[in-house]
């Protein structure tokens, strides 16, 4: 009987040992799952932080690009302002220049008038030299092909000696500042 009892005890010990092993394995599995959940939460947090970092980096790069564009635009505006600084002064002086040209077109036999005209011509030439220094030029007209960017056609002509669309007369001089037209030439164009 003692042998049976020993076998029963042994069997009970084995069962108990097996139950303990199963319990240990279950605890390990639960711990692993909990650790996996914790790891997954940590990974999710890391992923979220990485996404936020990427978003902030992208915003930073966009802001940096915007700043560079504003800086370039400011430089271009400043350069254009410097380049065309004398435009308003030239526009204000053009009527006076036109008056000089009309006065110089008159002729007289009187010596006093000739001296006055000579003085006016000197002033006129000085204004033209000052214009040239600032990059202001007369727009060529007579004999040139009509260009609506530089010329304003106010009359048509029928001259057989001139080509089609050729300017035959200039009624008012046009001027440009570097590459910008200040005032187009008023012209007569051949048909």
Curated annotation (Swiss-Prot):
<dbReference type="GO" id="GO:0006457">
    <property type="term" value="P:protein folding"/>
</dbReference>
<dbReference type="GO" id="GO:0000774">
    <property type="term" value="F:adenyl-nucleotide exchange factor activity"/>
</dbReference>
<dbReference type="GO" id="GO:0005737">
    <property type="term" value="C:cytoplasm"/>
</dbReference>
<comment type="similarity">
    <text>Belongs to the GrpE family.</text>
</comment>
<dbReference type="InterPro" id="IPR013805">
    <property type="entry name" value="GrpE_coiled_coil"/>
</dbReference>
<dbReference type="InterPro" id="IPR000740">
    <property type="entry name" value="GrpE"/>
</dbReference>
<keyword id="KW-0143">Chaperone</keyword>
<protein>
    <recommendedName>
        <fullName>Protein GrpE</fullName>
    </recommendedName>
</protein>
<keyword id="KW-0963">Cytoplasm</keyword>
<keyword id="KW-0346">Stress response</keyword>
<dbReference type="InterPro" id="IPR009012">
    <property type="entry name" value="GrpE_head"/>
</dbReference>
<dbReference type="GO" id="GO:0051082">
    <property type="term" value="F:unfolded protein binding"/>
</dbReference>
<comment type="subunit">
    <text>Homodimer.</text>
</comment>
<comment type="function">
    <text>Participates actively in the response to hyperosmotic and heat shock by preventing the aggregation of stress-denatured proteins, in association with DnaK and GrpE. It is the nucleotide exchange factor for DnaK and may function as a thermosensor. Unfolded proteins bind initially to DnaJ; upon interaction with the DnaJ-bound protein, DnaK hydrolyzes its bound ATP, resulting in the formation of a stable complex. GrpE releases ADP from DnaK; ATP binding to DnaK triggers the release of the substrate protein, thus completing the reaction cycle.</text>
</comment>
<dbReference type="Pfam" id="PF01025">
    <property type="entry name" value="GrpE"/>
</dbReference>
<dbReference type="GO" id="GO:0051087">
    <property type="term" value="F:protein-folding chaperone binding"/>
</dbReference>
<dbReference type="GO" id="GO:0042803">
    <property type="term" value="F:protein homodimerization activity"/>
</dbReference>
């Amino acid at each position: 009987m003692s042998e049976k009892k020993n076998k029963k005890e042994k069997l009970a010990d084995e069962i108990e040992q097996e139950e303990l092993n199963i319990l240990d394995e279950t605890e390990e599995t639960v711990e692993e799952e909990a650790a996996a959940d914790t790891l997954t939460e940590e990974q999710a947090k890391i992923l979220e932080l990485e996404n936020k970092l990427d978003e902030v980096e992208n915003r930073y790069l966009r802001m940096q690009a915007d700043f560079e564009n504003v800086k370039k635009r400011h430089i271009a505006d400043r350069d254009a302002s410097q380049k065309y600084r004398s435009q308003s002064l030239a526009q204000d002086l053009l009527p006076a220049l036109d008056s000089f040209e009309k006065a110089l077109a008159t002729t007289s036999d009187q010596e006093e008038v000739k001296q006055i005209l000579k003085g006016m011509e000197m002033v006129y030439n000085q204004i033209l030299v000052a214009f040239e220094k600032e990059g202001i030029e007369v727009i060529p007209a007579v004999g040139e092909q009509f260009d609506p960017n530089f010329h304003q056609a106010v009359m048509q002509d029928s001259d057989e000696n001139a080509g089609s669309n050729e300017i035959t007369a200039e009624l008012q001089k046009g001027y440009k500042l570097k590459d910008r037209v200040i005032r187009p030439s008023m012209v007569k164009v051949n048909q």
